[in-house]
Amino acid sequence: MARSLKKNPFVGNHLLKKINKLNTKGEKEIIVTWSRASTIIPTMIGHTIAVHNGKDHLPVYITDRMVGHKLGEFAPTRNFRGHVKNDNRSRR
């Protein structure tokens, strides 16, 4: 279910403060966050945000096409290695 248009998009306060501080300074540095539920807003464009996937922080470079999506969409949490081939000949 989509978020109501009456509400603003969710962005963690700590993340928003860091983005605004870097924008006023004009600096670019990696911002580490655990907030996968935060929505990407236009002020984040051009920044690199390291999003936690449960094990590591994966760096995500924010582009204009990502606006409106969540940060967690770009840091996959599961690693699928493929199905094991069932080789009956090797057991004999």
Curated annotation (Swiss-Prot):
Keyword Zinc-finger: no
One Gene Ontology molecular-function label: structural constituent of ribosome
Subcellular location, principal: plastid
Keywords recorded for this protein, A-Z: Chloroplast, Plastid, Ribonucleoprotein, Ribosomal protein, RNA-binding, rRNA-binding
BP terms from Gene Ontology: translation
Keyword Membrane: no
Domain of life according to the entry: Eukaryota
SUPFAM superfamilies hit by this protein: Ribosomal protein S19
GO cellular component term of the entry, any: small ribosomal subunit
Pfam families, sorted: Ribosomal_S19
Intracellular or extracellular location(s): Plastid, Chloroplast
Function: Protein S19 forms a complex with S13 that binds strongly to the 16S ribosomal RNA.
Family, similarity comment: Belongs to the universal ribosomal protein uS19 family.
Name the UniProt record assigns to this protein: Small ribosomal subunit protein uS19c
